[in-house]
């Protein structure tokens, strides 16, 4: 990994918005950041190297004070069954370098459709029957597009956790996803460049948002 201090004002503004979304709702940095930076002309690899360190850091900050509130059963399920999906999906992207803009658009549209009650109930029933396969598919979609978050939220929501366990468990799985993606990127590309400025900026925004909620 190579660390730099370069930054861009527009990028800082975008990162502020998506970091606030992540701190409030548990998703945002990858869900919104990925399509935004692709639309701005960044490659998928460049988008990953920008967003993954930030996502992992914010997830870590979310779970450190609440380690005891991570549901270990769910975390271990994702550790067992989603890693292969991420490995396959991300390696397909890195090796064949397809244009994923259409795929990202389809997944975002499908994420909106998850809000439809009838469709959501059908998916819930399918998940109960094919849970391991569903978790693998979440990993595969995340590896291909960086947008496994909505399905992750859907899967964890089936457990009817209270708010803190729900958010902390999602953050722990997001951290797991990001670490695996960064490892794959490092091995496939040889190095990735991480801007310390963006990294620290996201941390400041997270703490400011967290402080505002406390006050």
Regions found by a protein language model. Give the residues of each.
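Hydrophobic, well-ordered secondary-structure segments
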Residues: 100, 106-110, 130-138, 149, ...
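Membrane-interface helix termini and inter-helical loops of multi-pass transporters
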Residues: 1-2, 32, 90-98, 122-124, ...
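Membrane helix-loop-helix hairpins that form the core translocation module of multi-pass transporters
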Residues: 45-117
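Small-residue-rich hydrophobic segments that form or flank transmembrane alpha-helices
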Residues: 8-76, 135, 139, 143, ...
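Short, well-ordered alpha-helical segments in soluble proteins
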Residues: 110-120, 144, 148, 160
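Short, strongly hydrophobic alpha-helical membrane anchors
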Residues: 1-9
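Small-residue-mediated transmembrane helix hinge/kink sites in multi-pass secondary transporters
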Residues: 89-94, 154, 213-214
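Alpha-helical multi-pass membrane helix bundles of inner-membrane/thylakoid proteins
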Residues: 114-138
